[in-house]
Regions:
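A structural microfeature
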Residues: 113, 190-192, 257
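Conserved active-site tyrosine of GNAT-family acetyltransferases
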Residues: 104, 248, 253
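A conserved beta-strand-loop-helix scaffold within acyl/acetyltransferase catalytic domains
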Residues: 159-211
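N-terminal charged segments
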Residues: 1-87
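A short helix-loop-beta-strand connector motif used in the catalytic cores of GNAT acetyltransferases and
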Residues: 37-45, 89-93, 98, 112-115, ...
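Conserved acetyl-CoA-binding loop-helix of GNAT-fold acetyltransferases
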Residues: 75-82, 210-230, 250
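Acyl-donor-binding surface of acyltransferase catalytic domains
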Residues: 69-142, 156, 240, 259-264
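Conserved acetyl-CoA binding element of GNAT-fold acetyltransferases
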Residues: 60-70, 201-212
């Protein structure tokens, strides 16, 4: 080590995979949304080592997502990139950071929270689903419609209610590399939905939703387990809501850190 040689931070895409779980989680999250945007044909831009930005132009911000690839040391430059990319018409966007950010409220952003990033060790046994719940992969228009309807009504996503037609789980979205989607039925009624993305080192759970009328019956736990079962050889990760965290803890997840979610508006 010389006096001029920079110390390794452990953050960013240049850090070797496996160096630390938080960085692996962030880099694979960024890669997953780039893959989804590429499959759907959405706008995307990557500033290598800074931020990956994708824009589905949907009213739900989670699908218009900017993922920081390392801690931000120049908020002004980052805000310029975000405004340039998200300056066109469309819904709000989500700034997703695995590390703390400066307070961005003066710049028109709304703090959504600091939800926990949770980790489940590989190879843990999964519990069986309730006998009345039938979980299937999303592979066609019918199952995609059922999954998206369940996401919209179960999460819920008021921006997309009342549900009319698929806008997220399009045929092209189902072809995105690494992504797997599921829907659960009781008596042929869709009641639970979930997805996962399998990266090089981790599996990440996404899009977990259960209809309010059937909560408390183990369906949320079961659909989450189905998304994890795609690759039990990898540790599973997710970002938990307050409602979902107790369910994930029953599956063996523990909190390893917290991320920061900021809501950006196109006019900001």
């Amino acid at each position: 080590m010389t006096e001029t040689e920079p110390l390794e931070t452990g953050y960013g895409p240049s850090v070797p995979p496996g160096d630390n779980l938080t960085n692996d989680f962030v880099q694979e999250t960024a890669a997953s949304f780039r893959a989804l945007a590429a499959a759907r044909g959405d706008r995307s831009r990557r500033v290598d080592g800074v931020v990956s930005m994708t824009d589905a132009a949907l009213p739900l911000p989670f699908w218009n997502r900017a993922v920081l690839e390392q801690p931000c040391d120049d908020a002004g430059a980052l805000l310029t990139m975000l405004r340039e990319f998200y300056g066109s018409a469309g819904g709000p966007f989500l700034l997703d950071s695995g590390w703390p950010l400066p307070d961005l409220r003066a710049h028109g952003f709304v703090l959504m929270g600091h939800p926990p990033i949770m980790l489940r060790p590989a190879e843990l046994k999964l519990p069986p689903a309730p006998s009345e719940l039938r979980i299937v992969r999303v592979t066609d228009e019918a199952t995609a419609t059922d999954q998206e309807r369940t996401l919209v009504d179960g999460y819920p996503a008021p921006q997309l209610q009342p549900f009319r037609a698929v806008t997220m789980m399009t045929p092209k979205a189902l072809e995105a590399t690494g992504w797997h989607h599921f829907v659960g039925y009781v008596d042929d009624r869709p009641v639970a939905a979930g997805s996962s993305y399998v990266g090089d080192r981790l599996l990440r759970v996404e899009n977990i939703a259960t209809l309010d009328s059937v909560r408390g019956r183990g369906y949320g736990l079961a659909i989450t387990a189905a998304t994890i079962a795609v690759d039990l050889a990898k540790p599973a990760t997710l970002v938990a809501s307050d409602l979902g965290r107790p369910i994930y803890e029953k599956l063996g997840f523990t909190s390893m850190s917290r991320c920061s979610y900021w809501l950006g508006m196109r006019s900001a």
